[in-house]
Amino acid sequence: MSSTYSTNLGIELMGTGDQAGNWGATTNVNLGTLIEQAIAGYTTYSCSGGTDTLTMTNGASATARNMYIQLNGTGGGTVVVPGTSPNANTKLYFIFNNTSSAITVKVSGQTGVSVPAAAKIVLACNGTDIISAINYIPSATLPSPTLTGTPVEIGRAHV
């Protein structure tokens, strides 16, 4: 039986009886690299300002598998993440747009989400497109301002 790969993360699923004497190496890559990238991976990516495509290679370390991606380089472009074959890639992304212009994060052929310059955002790939993972933020309650000191009149000339 041949190995296959998981739908969302491209993790190798060894077939019964496969890789005699080598299963440990595959398991170590799956657990120590691929799953770790998916749930705690942090990487930086240098954007070109055009269309940049992040990949998720089956059974190997890949930028698009990381949970947190800091986008550096030239803003104003598009970052495309895998959304279809070989990986449906339904997963969360924490994105930090560390450029001076907005960047659109999307799946090829879709609209995606525009991430403003210097913004940090949580996005979700639903297998078809990138969407905002958060649609509710409770309102913040701010304390009333308190002014102290002596009042000063500004802008009035005394003759």
For the regions a protein language model found, what residue spans apply to each?
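Intrinsically disordered, low-complexity segments enriched in Ser/Pro/Gly/Ala and basic residues
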Residues: M1-S2, V107, P138, P143
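Exposed extracellular interaction/assembly regions and N-terminal maturation sites
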Residues: S2-I103, T146-R156
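Short, surface-exposed terminal/edge motifs of secreted or surface/virion proteins that either
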Residues: L31-A40, S101-G109, A124-Y136
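Residues within well-ordered beta-strands of beta-sheet-rich folds
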Residues: F94, V122-A124
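Surface-exposed loop/edge segments in extracytoplasmic proteins
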Residues: Q110-S114
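Tight coil/turn sites that cap or link beta-strands
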Residues: A117-K120
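Low-complexity, small-hydrophobic/phenylalanine-enriched stretches
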Residues: D129, Y136-H158
